[in-house]
Regions:
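Phosphate-binding and adjacent anionic-ligand microenvironments
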Residues: 15-167
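Cysteine protease catalytic core and zymogen-processing segment of caspase-like enzymes
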Residues: 1-14
Length: 167
């Protein structure tokens, strides 16, 4: 999945590209993206869901790589658009250079930077007013602990994203 491949691209290309351009991710992307990027001294910008937000920023600024959970990955040195063929070539090149199975590399990345975790819940509402009321209610009633994990942060960029403490 992209939750595995975007971290792979950042890790692999970060080893061979000599730049410090930032990484773009949508709010729905796993925080392993942030962990890898920060290990390479890259800023990470978290954007609303949708590749259009990534493309807009790629057009305006020098960007290393940007991706979203649905599979869209854009490479800053190529073009500000999703390109599956280019991504496949980068992936195959990396596999050939490392001379190991992809799952082994992905396991190493998760050992070094934490697990890739993704859980998304989409809820349809009959109108915007009801949606806003439910969102406000949830925000006002978020517990300090979730399943015995301390709440670390709340993102309201595009919906509600809860980050819990790893420990």
């Amino acid at each position: 999945s992209t939750q595995d491949l975007l971290p792979y691209f950042i890790s692999y290309l970060g080893e061979i590209k000599n730049n410090s351009y930032p990484v773009l991710k949508t709010v729905s992307g796993s925080d392993i993206i942030k962990n890898i990027s920060e290990s390479q001294n890259r800023d990470v910008f978290e954007l609303p869901v949708g590749f259009k937000y990534i493309a807009e920023k790629m057009i305006k600024e020098k960007i290393f790589i940007g991706g979203e959970e649905s599979g869209g990955v854009g490479f800053g040195d190529f073009m500000p658009e999703r390109d599956a063929l280019y991504a496949a070539m980068v992936l195959l090149n990396g596999i050939a250079e490392k001379s190991q199975y992809l799952y082994e590399t992905l396991d190493e990345i998760q050992e070094d930077f934490g697990p890739s975790f993704y859980k998304r819940i989409d809820i349809k509402f009959p109108n915007q007013s009801e949606k806003n009321n439910v969102k406000e209610f949830i925000i006002d009633n978020i517990p300090e602990n979730i399943n015995n994990h301390k709440l670390k942060s709340i993102s309201k960029i595009d919906g509600i994203k809860l980050r819990i403490d790893k420990n």
